[in-house]
Amino acid sequence: MEAIADLIVSRWFTPEAPRELVDGHRAMLVSTPPDGYAATCEAVAAWDFRDRLGDVRAETLVIAAAEDRAAPLEYSKLIADGVPSARLVVFDRAAHLANVERADAFSELVSAHVRQRVEVA
């Protein structure tokens, strides 16, 4: 994992992310068993539910990051376009781990989405 850690982490965070945040996630990655990481990558690569997006009936919040090289914005747009009741929000100044890099904004957005669903119910 050490051999690929810097490349992977560079996809997870923007260059402006706090160093301690990046270093902590890099350490976590390096401690991950290589076979488990590879199996997870294979599973995600094989997972394709595009043909079922129209079946989603829940109000859906699709969150993307403008600088995400691991899951580019066009993937999020595809999901948002395919799910009938989807809304796409794009975080600037964030990469693949936008929920970590922009934790406060991410939590606020998700909390508002959930609150709105609860109020409607």
Give each language-model segment a name.
Residues 1-54:
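Conserved alpha/beta-hydrolase catalytic His-Asp/Glu region
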Residues 8, 41-44, 79, 106, ...:
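Hydrophobic "lid"/C-terminal helical patch
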Residues 54-55, 80-82:
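Solvent-exposed polar/charged
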Residues 57-58, 85:
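Active-site acidic short loop of glycosyltransferases
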Residues 69-75:
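Conserved alpha/beta-hydrolase "acid-adjacent" motif
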Residues 85-121:
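Catalytic active-site module of serine/aspartate enzymes centered on a nucleophile-bearing elbow/loop
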